[in-house]
Amino acid sequence: MDGILIFLLSYSPGQYLVRAMQRNHLPLALALIQPDETVGDDFEELELTVNQGIHGSQDNANALLRAGIPCIYFAGSRLNGELKEFVADFGAAAKTVRQLQSMKIGIIGKLPGMGDVVTDDMAVYRRIGPEFVYDSIGTVTKFCDTVKPEEVAERVAYERTVFDVDPKMPPERHAEAVRMYIGIKRYLEANDYAGYTIHFDEFGADGRYTQLPLLAASSLMADGYGYAAEGDATTAMLMAAMVQLCGEANFSEMYMMDLKREAILLCHAGEGNYATARKDRKPFLMDRVFNEGGLSNPPTPIFAPEPGPACVMSLVHTEGETFKLVYSRGEIVDKCDLRKCDMPYMFFRPETGVRPCVKAWLEQGGTHHETVVLGEYENRIRMLCRLIGIEFVSV
């Protein structure tokens, strides 16, 4: 069981709900609906009393609030589809709360000096649920060494149906990227991780790798794993949570304000969830010159996501067990013709405008790594924040 949903059709004393809910550890929601959705001109006291659910709902909501028990509320029609949507959103949020309690995120390395990725692991564990587990690059290497050539060949053949592969790509370079993908996936599966973060310098310093795992990160995001770069376990956790809650998510960062387009260019070193790519063209798998880590060219998927409604968010740890979700709703702009951007990228147009959004992002301490969700899921994201005690801040 993931949660409890109360349908309060008539009056119920709120005081008597408190004891049971103090013993309850499941997410809670209360939906106020009525047998009749309009007041009849000839209603007598019986009809009015039968439809008096608002009376009991107020009593119960007040009692829950004063007891410090979080609850999600609905008031509306049971006939026009809005109740069905509420139940779906609450069910997804409640299930995500449960999954967060057992979630694990793998961590290998961290970029020194990057302050906004630093958090208190135990505060995350107590307030939100996931466990951050620290591993070594040797652990990943062990799993990569188990990958067989025939497994690599099968995956390479599959990827040639997914991507337009750069004709300059040496076959052995693509094969090595695939070997790393399969190995890292086995590392995640063996440890039951919902997501991971790796600092790329670990691969250059190790001496056993010839390229950075950009394709691996992109493919694992497409498989449904949470991800963030540079040891940012918080964003990897947030992405994993959004995958559970919304079905799909992406990792990126704000690269540049585009004041002319009233948009923000988002991209990262070369990772992106190509399952979100626009449907009218294949992603391009590029034999890309990239000097970070001091290694050879990493095969890099280049694409832009499907245009339409979207949101960009960041989980901020302020102090103690206090967290807030900095959230911007807007749209992915239909722009995918940057000629020399050798990374997955997107133009995000905030609903509030680029200047107010970015200014408020700074004021709220929003981090430089973000999770991106395509579609309209704000209701269930707000529910999740309320259920786990995180402030939702719209910018």
Where are these regions (language model features)?
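Short, acidic/small-residue loops that bind anionic groups at enzyme active sites
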Residues: 18-45, 50-56, 218-231
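Cap/lid and interdomain-hinge subdomains that line or gate substrate/regulatory clefts
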Residues: 32, 36-169
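Flexible loop/turn segments at secondary-structure boundaries
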Residues: 12-15, 37-38, 80-82, 112-116, ...
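Beta-alpha junction/loop-to-helix N-cap segments that form part of ligand/metal-binding clefts
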Residues: 1-25
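C-terminal catalytic subdomain
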Residues: 221-339
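Long, internal scaffold/assembly segments composed of regular secondary structure
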Residues: 156-245
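Extended hydrophobic packing segments that form well-structured cores
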Residues: 294-395
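Periplasmic-binding protein-like
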Residues: 2-10, 29-31, 193-199
